C-alpha cells in the first residue's frame, strides 16, 4: 500500500463476511510472522489513527489488504486512482475473497438533458450499496471518482426496496405501482433488467441485481407462487419463496423529493420536459445529473460505511 492511509475505528463484529473463507488462508499466516504487519494490525485494532505502509508492489499491497480484511471482519473500502486500477485490484482481491465487490464510477452525462448508464453498471453500484446498508462486512474496491460522486441517501434506497414473499397479501396494481415508483420500466414483455410487466394474473419483473426475472402469480390479492424464468423463451426455471427487489435506479423519487424537483425546475424553461415527467410521476432520464435538486445533503459512498469501517487509500 504505497502511500496508503488506513483509517479505522475498531469494534468487534461477530458477523462473518459473505463469501469470507472460514479457514485461515496460508498466505495470511505468513504475514502473522511479520513484525511490521503485527504492528500495523495492532495499530488498527488499538484505534491509534491513520497508518502508512510504503515500498510495496501491487501484489503485496492486495495481499496485505486481504489479510487486514480477514482480521477485521467488517466493511473495508479500498480506494484506487482510476477505473483501470480498480478493475485490476478487484480481480486480485477476488483470488482471496471471490465475493469482493467493485463499485464503479457513474458514467458522465452526454449533456444537460441526456444521461445514459448501462444496467450492468447500475446493478453493480446498487448491489454494493444494498450490502453496505445491511451492514454486511464486505470488501469494496472503488476508484476515487466513484467515492466522490453524490448519491441518494441510504434511507431512500431502503425505502424503495421491496421484499416479496409467497403468501403476501397485496393488490397486483398496488405492487406494480411500487415497482414503477422504484424506477422499473413497464413493458409488454419482461426481457431485460429494470423491466416489469403485468400479464393477466401475474407480474413479471426483472430485478436490477438479478440474473433472471421473476414471475409473481396471484390468487386474488395473495401472492400464490413465484418462479424465476428464462427471459429468452419466457419458460419458468425454478420456484422461489422470497425475492428482494432493489430499486432500478440510483435515484428513486418519493413524493417530497419529486415536489422539491418540480419547485426547483419550475422557473427553468429549458427543463420543461423534465418538469412534466416529474408531474406525471416519472423519473427523468437525467435525474442523476439533477441530484442536488432532490437531495440536499452531501451524500457519498463514505456515508454508506459504518463508523468502524476500514478505508485504505491504495496509491
Question: Could you tell me what each predicted segment is?
Answer:
Residues 1-315:
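ASCE RecA-like P-loop NTPase motor cores
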Amino acid at each position: 500500500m504505497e502511500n496508503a492511509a488506513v483509517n479505522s475505528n475498531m469494534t468487534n463484529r461477530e458477523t462473518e463476511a459473505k463469501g469470507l473463507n472460514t479457514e485461515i488462508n496460508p498466505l495470511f499466516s505468513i504475514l502473522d510472522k511479520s513484525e511490521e504487519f503485527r504492528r500495523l494490525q495492532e495499530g488498527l485494532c488499538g484505534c491509534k489513527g491513520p497508518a502508512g505502509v510504503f515500498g510495496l508492489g501491487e501484489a503485496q499491497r492486495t495481499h496485505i489488504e486481504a489479510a487486514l480484511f480477514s482480521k477485521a471482519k467488517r466493511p473495508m473500502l479500498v480506494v484506487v486512482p482510476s477505473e483501470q486500477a480498480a478493475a485490476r485490484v478487484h480481480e486480485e482481491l477476488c483470488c482471496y475473497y471471490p465475493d469482493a465487490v467493485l463499485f464503479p464510477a457513474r458514467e458522465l452525462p452526454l449533456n444537460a438533458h441526456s444521461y445514459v448508464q448501462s444496467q450492468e453498471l447500475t446493478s453493480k453500484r446498487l448491489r454494493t450499496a444494498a450490502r453496505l446498508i445491511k451492514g454486511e462486512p464486505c470488501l469494496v474496491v472503488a476508484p476515487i471518482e466513484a467515492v466522490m460522486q453524490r448519491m441518494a441517501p441510504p434511507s431512500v434506497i431502503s425505502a424503495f426496496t421491496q421484499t416479496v414473499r409467497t403468501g403476501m397479501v397485496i393488490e397486483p396494481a398496488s405492487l406494480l405501482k411500487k415497482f414503477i415508483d422504484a424506477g422499473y420500466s413497464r413493458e409488454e414483455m419482461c426481457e431485460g433488467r429494470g423491466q416489469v410487466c403485468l400479464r393477466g394474473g401475474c407480474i413479471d419483473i426483472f430485478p436490477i441485481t438479478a440474473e433472471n426475472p421473476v414471475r409473481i402469480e396471484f390468487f386474488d390479492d395473495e401472492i400464490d407462487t413465484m418462479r424465476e424464468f428464462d427471459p429468452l423463451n419466457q419458460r419458468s426455471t425454478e420456484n422461489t419463496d422470497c425475492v428482494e427487489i432493489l430499486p432500478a435506479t440510483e435515484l428513486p423519487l418519493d413524493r417530497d423529493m419529486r415536489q422539491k424537483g418540480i419547485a426547483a425546475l419550475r422557473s427553468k424553461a429549458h427543463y420543461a420536459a423534465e418538469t412534466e415527467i416529474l408531474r406525471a410521476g416519472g423519473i427523468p432520464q437525467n435525474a442523476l445529473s439533477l441530484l442536488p435538486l432532490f437531495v440536499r445533503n452531501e451524500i457519498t459512498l463514505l456515508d454508506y460505511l459504518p463508523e468502524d469501517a476500514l478505508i485504505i487509500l491504495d496509491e
